[in-house]
UniProtKB/Swiss-Prot annotation:
This is Large ribosomal subunit protein uL5. It comes from Ehrlichia chaffeensis (strain ATCC CRL-10679 / Arkansas). PROSITE patterns: RIBOSOMAL_L5 (PS00358). This is one of the proteins that bind and probably mediate the attachment of the 5S RNA into the large ribosomal subunit, where it forms part of the central protuberance. In the 70S ribosome it contacts protein S13 of the 30S subunit (bridge B1b), connecting the 2 subunits; this bridge is implicated in subunit movement. Contacts the P site tRNA; the 5S rRNA and some of its associated proteins might help stabilize positioning of ribosome-bound tRNAs. One of its GO terms (biological process) is translation. Belongs to the universal ribosomal protein uL5 family. Part of the 50S ribosomal subunit; part of the 5S rRNA/L5/L18/L25 subcomplex. Contacts the 5S rRNA and the P site tRNA. Forms a bridge to the 30S subunit in the 70S ribosome.
């Protein structure tokens, strides 16, 4: 399991690579946030229910619906309209999800060559977009209404992008260059 790998192998390795004197200085993954945005389709209760069901299967816990904060005429949404769902994973469920993401989902993603450094936000957090949620093994292709995209945000307590990249490479994330 990734949690055991982190404690036994990754922490000592990063401590020497980054030159830290204390193990508490070593960066770690704090949480993983999953989001499915539906936009105007969120007002359809059938689509919204399938979105919630699929995200619950992917994450292993119940997602929360997200609502529009303000009206935008160009997108045909009004304040308070449901526009998607999200879930935040921490601790054991987070590590289980990351293991599935690294070893199953990313290799199954079509035209995936690796993660780029440009996907970091400058503070050590990584954002990944999965184009088709059917890449997850938990989703049965015959039971889905529409193929949805999933946004995955991996939040670390790393000081900068380089430390976060080293951390994620130790976990086995495939990076380009």
């Amino acid at each position: 399991m990734l949690k055991d790998l982190y404690k036994s192998h990754i922490v000592p390795s990063l401590k020497t690579k980054l030159g830290y004197s204390n193990v508490m200085q070593v960066p770690k993954i704090v949480k993983v946030c999953l989001n499915i945005g539906l936009g105007i389709r969120g007002s359809d209760s059938k689509v919204m229910n399938s979105c919630v069901r699929d995200l619950a299967l992917i994450a292993g816990q119940k997602p929360v619906a997200t609502y529009a904060k303000k009206s935008i005429a160009g997108f045909k949404i009004r304040k308070g309209f449901p526009i998607g769902c999200k879930v935040t994973l921490r601790n054991n469920k987070m590590y289980e999800f990351l293991e599935r993401l690294i070893h199953v989902v990313l290799p199954r993603e079509q035209d995936f060559k690796g993660l780029s450094v440009s996907q970091f936000d400058g503070c050590g957090n990584l954002s990944i977009g999965i184009k088709e949620h059917i890449s997850f093994l938990e989703i049965d292709y015959d039971k889905i209404d529409k193929i949805l995209g999933v946004d995955i945000n991996i939040v670390t307590n790393a000081v900068n992008n380089n430390d976060a990249k080293l951390l994620l490479m130790e976990f086995g994330f495939p990076f380009i260059n």
